[in-house]
Amino acid sequence: MAAKGGTVKAASGFNAAEDAQTLRKAMKGLGTDEDAIINVLAYRSTAQRQEIRTAYKTTIGRDLMDDLKSELSGNFEQVILGMMTPTVLYDVQELRKAMKGAGTDEGCLIEILASRTPEEIRRINQTYQLQYGRSLEDDIRSDTSFMFQRVLVSLSAGGRDESNYLDDALMRQDAQDLYEAGEKKWGTDEVKFLTVLCSRNRNHLLHVFDEYKRIAQKDIEQSIKSETSGSFEDALLAIVKCMRNKSAYFAERLYKSMKGLGTDDDTLIRVMVSRAEIDMLDIRANFKRLYGKSLYSFIKGDTSGDYRKVLLILCGGDD
């Protein structure tokens, strides 16, 4: 499939000061005009939302984020505040939230660190340090352990080869090494999996996966499932999935956040907010292909109220 891109585009005829006034009016006095807030913010790009925030402060003398926080609540508030947060800072806040307090949201750590580009990871590291006065790596170390910790530390280094270069000999060697590290012996050399999956470029890895299948007579995903377990397994699978088809990986994250009883709203919100401008159309196409139903219909059936309204706009239509 050719990449289709995002659903949220910059609005034409954009006037930040006008939008700021509309938002103030929606929140002033008794009650809140949620529709007015949705109609402005859901139809603006992240960059435009930042301009609105500046215009709001300049022309009204109040902070838009603070006003939204005091007027809105629940999941609707969470989506709107997420949309108002600059992209890298949003990732940083989500990573922090995943590690703060008791318990760890391993899924969130894996999702962000396995799917972002090395350049994005480097920016995440800088912003995390500025925001919290300590490094992302230190927080990962204090919150996770064993091989799972090691794979996250490795991903958080942002050191993956970004070229398209394919060294045929190294590619064959990697495939052979992975085979020997797992399927071929009793016990698993987990570090080998980590080294290859966390440092090689995408083009190289796609060839490694093909060669691996030829040698092992099975997909690398099958081997990862039988050779590793727990969060370490989840992380390796996420890396492979993101290399093969990142939009399909996010489609699966969305599907799992909604299928069955209850909804994992944190994941649903994070993926919808962070992918709306990047590859939401591709995620939708993959969702339909994988699950036979549209993402739109899933969101519609799983959410309600203003929360549902804004998610459906980010989704951008039915398939």
Swiss-Prot record:
UniProt keyword Acetylation, yes or no: yes
GO cellular component, one term: membrane
UniProt GO MF annotations: calcium ion binding; calcium-dependent phospholipid binding; carbohydrate binding; chondroitin sulfate binding; heparin binding; phosphatidylserine binding
Residues with PTM N-acetylalanine: A2
Keywords associated with the record: Acetylation, Annexin, Calcium, Calcium/phospholipid-binding, Cytoplasmic vesicle, Membrane, Phosphoprotein, Repeat
Chain positions with N6-acetyllysine modification: K213, K293, K300
Keyword Acetylation: yes
Annexin repeats: 14-85, 86-157, 169-241, 245-316
Major localization listed first in the record, in broad terms: membrane
Gene3D superfamilies (UniProt xref): Annexin (1.10.220.10)
Phosphothreonine: modified positions: T7
Spans traversing the lipid bilayer: none
InterPro entries per the UniProt record, alphabetical: Annexin, Annexin_repeat, Annexin_repeat_CS, Annexin_sf, ANX4
SMART domains membership: ANX (SM00335)
SUPFAM superfamilies on file: Annexin (SSF47874)
Span of the signal peptide: none
Membrane topology: Peripheral membrane protein
Description of how the protein assembles with itself and partners: Monomer. Binds to SFTPA1 in a Ca(2+)-dependent manner.
Domain commentary: A pair of annexin repeats may form one binding site for calcium and phospholipid.
Family: Belongs to the annexin family.
Miscellaneous: Seems to bind one calcium ion with high affinity.
Protein name (database record): Annexin A4
Naturally occurring in which organism (per UniProt): Bos taurus
